[in-house]
Design a protein with these regions (language model features):
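Conserved N-terminal phosphate-binding loop of PLP-dependent enzymes in the Aspartate aminotransferase
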Residues: 4-405
Length: 405
């Protein structure tokens, strides 16, 4: 490759061939080459325009090319992109304060992806546990959960599909049915250092537990001096109509993990703890080269300040209710096809009878992007800025898909 060749335009066929040739085959991709995004719209390199109701897997919280986010990242790139966490930066200090305020926590650790955040949370919980007793290392998580594909998060993830071929998994992990307090109670003892849950299961099918379930989990953790970890990688950052989903129930975790939407599309993640857990880790116990770098912190600061200044938390709650009601109209129209509509804010799931993939493909053919999870749940996690007019476009595409599939 000669200098400058990377900037030459490739056609669709070449792009796909080059990607398939060099990238490990770990993704199931659609034969589309995305080129440009603006707001809630994205264009492929053949000029086709799509309304995106998936937001890059709940990541693009401000949509595509939000001017505040673009300006913040561009200006920071022109000043300082990386210097390591051996030094202080102003933008990191600003981002830390914003995350602390949004999460309701006191201390923050920045990482690069949700799995890293969850790994760090479990690592802190293990150290907390064994400081109390050498056998206090058990971590309980839920069936149908998803916490990442790194080795320890894999053991905490409640899908057999992800476990096949990777045994023996990390020891000390126990799975229980989600929402079943008696099953959890049967596994709880003084050897449990943490319970790890999603306040709303995403990958498992957009399952919303009753508020009293989370309250009962909190009580069990308190009884056994176990830390309650909420994985808010997908549910956090205004996604559900609150800054973080735990705020719906009033059940505050001991550790909260975040990622996806917090950088508005820039890779950044981490976890947050109250002051009483701030010194479980000592210098050198945990860290990372890139976590909390200036570019990531600029993205975090711009994203959170924009969500706050534009009043998006309340707007998400309002638009989410409208969206859910429109989906319920489809359920009434197609009672044999739509089994359930559930979720909070702009994290919605429409469970269908039969496979969901044909519905996703039909929507794509009608220039709308949605996703299918758990085999038959159409997952809808659009940018937080989606308009009611764009919601109507998504619902119309789903209507066509349900009629045809």
């Amino acid at each position: 490759m000669y200098e400058g060749e990377i900037f030459l335009t490739m056609d669709k066929k070449t792009i796909i061939e080059e990607t398939e040739k060099y990238y490990l085959p770990v993704f199931g991709r659609y034969p589309m080459v995305m080129e440009l995004g603006q707001g809630c719209r994205v264009w492929d390199n053949e000029g086709n325009e799509y309304v995106d109701a998936f937001a890059g897997i709940a990541v693009n919280s401000l949509g595509y090319n939000h001017p505040v986010l673009v300006k913040a990242i561009s200006e920071q790139a022109g000043k300082l992109m990386h210097c390591s966490n051996l030094y202080y930066t102003e933008i990191q200090a600003k981002a830390l304060r914003m995350v602390a305020e949004a999460t309701g926590m006191d201390r923050i650790f920045f990482a690069n992806c949700g799995a890293e955040g969850n790994e760090g949370a479990m690592k802190l919980a293990r150290k907390y546990g064994v400081s109390k007793a050498p056998t206090k290392y058990k971590i309980i998580s839920a069936d149908e959960s998803f916490h990442g594909r790194t080795f320890d998060t894999l053991a905490a993830t409640g899908h057999d599909y992800y476990h096949v071929g990777y045994g023996p998994l990390s020891p000390g992990h126990v799975l229980v049915p989600y929402g079943d307090i008696k099953a959890l109670e049967a596994q709880m003892d003084d050897n449990v250092c943490a319970v790890l849950l999603e306040p709303i299961q995403g990958e498992g099918g957009v399952h919303v537990p009753p508020d009293e379930y989370l309250q009962q989990v909190r009580a069990l953790c308190d009884k056994h001096d176990a830390l309650l970890i909420f994985d808010e990688v997908q549910t956090g950052v205004a996604r559900t109509g609150k800054w973080f989903a735990y705020m719906h129930s009033g059940v505050k975790p001991d550790i909260l993990t975040f990622a996806k939407g917090i950088g508005g599309g820039f890779p950044v993640a981490g976890f947050a703890v109250p002051e009483r857990l701030a010194h479980v880790f000592k210098p050198g116990d945990h860290g990372g080269t890139f976590g909390g770098n200036p570019l990531a912190c600029a993205a975090v600061y711009a994203t959170l300040t924009t969500i706050k200044s534009e009043g998006l938390v309340d707007k998400v709650a309002e638009k989410g209710e409208y969206f859910k009601n429109e989906l319920r109209k489809l359920q009434e129209k197609y009672p044999a096809r739509v089994k359930d509509v559930r979720g909070r804010g702009l994290m919605l799931g429409m469970e269908v009878a039969g496979e969901g993939k044909p519905i996703v493909e039909s929507c794509l053919a009608n220039n709308v992007i949605v996703n299918c999870t758990a085999g038959n749940v159409i997952r809808i996690v659009p940018p937080l800025i989606i308009s009611k007019e764009e919601i109507d476009i998504v619902v119309a595409a789903l209507d066509k898909a349900l009629a045809a599939c």
